[in-house]
Amino acid sequence: MELQFDEKGLIPVITQDVKTKEVLMLAYANEEAIKLTLKTGFAHYWSRSRKKLWKKGETSGNVQRVVEIRYDCDCDALLYLVEQKGNACHTGNYSCFYRRLEGDEVRC
């Protein structure tokens, strides 16, 4: 079975700290981003807003060295296990999942 990309040629990527197992972020990758990740050992993604490839930490220095890549049972999602340098989130938080949903109010 092959990886199952969506109609836009993307696959969701969950990124997790290899040591702590903390979930750091959710992003998307296309085939080229996955190939670059495998070739370089550093996480590459597809930016849906900018519509271009990006190496995580390219400007901030907060790179992700990929230790292992796993795929799920349906071959439609990836898990990058990484060594995170600095913070993963553009807000300055270590993880993008730093807020808790309580009640019915969501502030984005």
UniProtKB/Swiss-Prot annotation:
**Pathway involvement of the protein, from the record:** Amino-acid biosynthesis; L-histidine biosynthesis; L-histidine from 5-phospho-alpha-D-ribose 1-diphosphate: step 3/9
The encoding gene: hisI
Instruction: Tell me the residue numbers annotated for binding Zn(2+).
Output: C73, C89, C96
Q: Which HAMAP family does the annotation name? A: HisI
Q: What does this protein do?
A: Catalyzes the hydrolysis of the adenine ring of phosphoribosyl-AMP.
- Which major enzyme category is it? hydrolase
Give an example GO molecular function.
phosphoribosyl-AMP cyclohydrolase activity
Specify the protein name.
Answer: Phosphoribosyl-AMP cyclohydrolase
Question: What reaction(s) does this enzyme catalyze?
Answer: 1-(5-phospho-beta-D-ribosyl)-5'-AMP + H2O = 1-(5-phospho-beta-D-ribosyl)-5-[(5-phospho-beta-D-ribosylamino)methylideneamino]imidazole-4-carboxamide
